[in-house]
UniProtKB/Swiss-Prot annotation:
InterPro entries: Gyrase/topoIV_suA_C, Topo_IIA-like_dom_sf, Topo_IIA_A/C_ab, Topo_IIA_A_a_sf, Topo_IIA_dom_A, TopoIV_A_Gneg, Type_II_DNA_Topoisomerases. Heterotetramer composed of ParC and ParE. It comes from Neisseria gonorrhoeae. The keyword Transmembrane helix does not apply. The gene is parC. The record marks R125 as: Transition state stabilizer. It holds the Pfam family DNA_topoisoIV. This is DNA topoisomerase 4 subunit A. Topoisomerase IV is essential for chromosome segregation. It relaxes supercoiled DNA. Performs the decatenation events required during the replication of a circular DNA molecule. It catalyses: ATP-dependent breakage, passage and rejoining of double-stranded DNA.
């Protein structure tokens, strides 16, 4: 037996390996988060970007200066502030100079700085750079005491912790980065809109994100495009700080002679470029079999035929005058333009999702996902602090200068006596202080100035400067002593910057339906298979033998869906309080495991679907929750247009949504039709279907009364005089019994009667 003691956590010479590894990993993770990947809410910059801007300013590379070689700038950055590889610094410089990447480029790049088609920049020895005018928004106040500095990596120089941004740059140019355990995707926004929103929030701090979206309706991308995401979805994204917007290209239809026409694409979504789109069309019109396959599958053959039937020619006519100009010519002028454009959007990157994940370093120096109001409020807090520091810094300068000038004024009024004292004194500084009441600083200044500065003309200039500085001192004291006046000053400065640097919105915000390809396959019957763990797949045909269907380990069948309305071109709904609509053609077929439902729709908080539904819009379903409430809803009211779904059934915390039950049209006119509900305590109730409301959404009415700790577990709709009860005895034996409905019939909301079973209820259904 080993009797040696274990290393103690308090032993000064040892540390448990697990604790050391945990601490080391956390330190590494936070260094990546803070030091590389995430921007600051204060100035919108990552450390390398901040160092690039500061180094270029120190080199005097302002907008009006002569540009210098990029290699020289990179050397300055690496030598003084950023001891990493030169490629990381140069790549960051290149991105900051690309007008198709940043909405407001901060570097004016001369030479080849890459293209929107993915071409790389020339080597740093060939390109030149200087700052753009808008970079002044970050740098103009750097030497006015606005921000703190810290030593660089070797202590030889100081670098700023933040840049004193005059506008919320974190929203203007956005950011993208991947850290350890987190990532950020902040899109760019319009300067005018962001500034107006910040001013509105400064004037009225009680404004919420929905109010601020009157000024900032959506992102504004450098390349333009059209955002088609609905307004309520955009609001949800800005309120939560996470989501995705749907962006499509902008185009025009050019009419030609003899009824011919063509489509000209002039603006592309982010992350799309002309070369990528041409490659996608080539892949679809001239596809190659996948590795290990001898021929194309039917889906790819259908897509090839569709694209070849629609498109005659595609040309890239982009040039210096037209950064994006893609020309699409149809096979025939008789092709419907909407069908042509919809197919292009659905099959290429002309339409796609842009992720938004508003993660950044806050003023508390912690990474967090923030909503729109929080971002603007934190930046305003930062701006108020920087302006206050700037005012105090300037006031200190003014007071020092006033002190010097007041000493000179005393000397000017007694110039002859001053000269006499200086000539005859062994200690002129002490004598000047004694005779004229000067301070040591004033006496030092008098002894160092030239006599010509005491001429009569200089006296007039002296008095003028004194008066101007006293007026400025008064204004500065007003701003520092009155928060309202300080806020007015900030607003005035923001309005001036908006007037100087603001521009029109580039990205159109206009809601539209998502482009969906509907002609790649015939409308064929399919069977959908949903597993307990939320995996879905499809099989061709109806009435299939699924007994040999395999599932992933630990998973099993939850539900199959077929019937007269389950076809490849229909949209099944997935119920879980929210309803989600999916094009059945998007669900993979074959013998594989399928895909997680969560890859097709945005389930909230790891939820799994309760059931799948399909049918005509007028089809009705009974929706209910374990809390004993429910209502009848039309399938048409459950259609959700966005991946995040549509809230239909409201359930209290801790409650679950029960599987929906179909209610056929004949049920509403049949006086014998009953809704039947059962509980976890084996009680059941039946009541006429007419006692339950038809609603579009909500919590519904009480179906059955529940005791404390009891829940509703089963529902059914039946016109039969008997109900089929399937139960499991205490020893696991299965039982099937028929129960007259009349025995449990009562008014809606009553507690019903105990079922004549000894075990647990497994199923409640109509005998037919």
């Amino acid at each position: 037996m080993n009797t040696q003691p274990h290393a103690s956590h308090t032993d000064s010479n040892t540390l448990m390996l697990g604790r050391y590894a945990e601490r080391a990993y956390l330190e590494y993770a936070m260094s990546v988060v803070k030091g590389r990947a995430l921007p600051e809410v204060s100035d919108g910059q990552k450390p390398v970007q901040r160092r690039i801007l500061f180094a270029m300013r120190d080199m005097g590379l302002t907008a009006g200066a002569k540009p210098v070689k990029s290699a020289r700038v990179v050397g300055e950055i690496l030598g003084k502030y950023h001891p990493h590889g030169d490629s990381s610094a140069y790549e960051a410089m290149v991105r900051m100079a690309q007008d198709f990447t940043l909405r407001y480029p901060l570097i004016d790049g001369i030479g080849n700085f890459g293209s929107r088609d993915g071409d790389g920049a020339a080597a740093m020895r060939y390109t030149e750079a200087r700052l753009t005018p808008i970079a002044e928004l970050l740098l103009s106040e750097i030497n006015q005491g606005t921000v703190d500095f810290m030593p660089n990596y070797d202590g030889a120089f100081d670098e700023p912790l933040h840049l004193p941004a005059r506008l919320p740059m974190v929203l203007l140019n956005g950011a993208s980065g991947i850290a350890v355990g987190m990532a950020t995707e902040i899109p760019s926004h319009n300067l005018n809109e962001v500034t107006q929103a910040a001013i509105a929030l400064l004037k009225k701090p009680t404004l919420e994100t929905a109010d601020l979206m009157q000024y900032i309706p959506a992102p504004d991308f450098a390349g333009g495009g059209q955002i088609i995401t609905p307004a309520d979805e955009l609001r949800r994204i800005y309120e939560t700080g996470k989501g995705s917007v749907r962006v499509r290209a902008r185009y025009e239809i050019e009419k030609l002679a003899r009824g011919q026409w063509r489509v000209i694409v002039t603006e592309l979504p982010p992350n799309a470029n002309s070369a990528k789109i041409l490659a996608e069309i080539e892949e679809q019109t001239n596809p190659k079999p996948k590795a290990g396959k001898k021929q194309l599958n039917q889906d790819r053959l259908n897509t090839k035929k569709l694209m070849l039937d629609l498109i005659d020619r595609v040309r890239d006519e982009s040039d210096g005058e037209h950064p994006v100009r893609l020309v699409f010519e149809p096979k025939s002028s008789r092709i419907d333009t909407d069908t042509f454009i919809n197919t292009l959007m659905a099959q290429t990157s002309l339409e796609g999702n842009v992720s938004m994940n508003l993660v950044m370093m806050g003023l508390d120096n912690r990474p967090a996902q923030k909503n729109l109001k929080t971002i603007l409020q934190e930046w305003l807090d930062f701006r108020i602090v920087t302006v206050t520091r700037r005012l105090k810094f300037r006031l200190n300068q003014v007071e020092k200068r006033l002190h010097i000038l007041e000493g000179r004024l005393k000397v000017f009024l007694h110039i002859d006596e001053v000269i006499k004292v200086i000539r005859e004194s062994d200690d002129p500084k002490a004598d000047l202080m004694a005779v004229f009441g000067l301070t040591e600083i004033q006496a030092e200044d008098i002894l160092e100035i030239r006599l010509r500065q005491l001429a009569r003309l200089e006296g007039f200039k002296l008095e003028k400067e004194l008066n101007e500085l006293r007026e400025e001192q008064g204004r500065l004291n007003i701003f520092l002593g009155d928060e309202n006046e300080k806020r007015k000053l900030i607003i005035k400065e923001m309005q001036a910057d908006m007037k100087q640097f603001g521009d029109a919105r580039r990205t159109l915000v206009e809601e539209a339906g998502r482009a969906v390809l509907t002609q790649t396959a015939a409308d064929e019957p399919i069977t959908l298979i949903l597993s307990e763990k939320g995996w879905i797949r499809s099989r061709a045909g109806h009435n299939l033998d699924l007994s040999q269907t395999a599932f992933k380990e630990g998973d099993r069948l939850k539900q199959t869906l077929e019937g007269p309305h389950c076809f490849t071109r229909r949209h099944p709904r997935f119920i879980r309080g929210r309803t989600y609509s999916i094009d059945a053609a998007e669900i993979p077929g074959g013998r594989g495991d399928g895909v997680p439902v969560s890859s097709l729709i945005e389930l909230q908080n790891g939820a799994k679907p309760v059931a799948m539904l399909t049918g005509l819009p007028e089809q009705h379903y009974l929706l209910s929750s374990s809390g004993g409430y429910g209502f009848i809803a039309k399938l048409g009211d459950m259609v959700g247009r966005v991946k995040a779904g549509k809230v239909v059934m409201t359930a209290d915390s801790g409650e679950t949504v029960l599987p929906p039950v179909a209610v056929y049209a004949s049920s509403f006119i049949n006086p014998d039709c009953k809704i039947i509900a059962a509980t976890s305590q084996n009680r059941a109730l039946a009541f006429p279907i007419g006692e339950l409301k038809i609603m579009a959404k909500g919590k519904g009415l009480q179906i059955i009364g529940l005791n404390a700790g009891e829940s509703m577990t089963h529902t059914a709709v039946s016109s039969e005089p008997e109900i089929l009860i399937e139960s499991e005895g205490r020893r696991g034996a299965a039982h099937k019994d028929r129960l007259p409905v009349a025995l449990i019939e009562a008014k809606r909301g009553k507690k019903g009667r105990l079922l004549p079973i000894s075990g647990s209820l497994k199923q409640l259904s109509s005998p037919k």
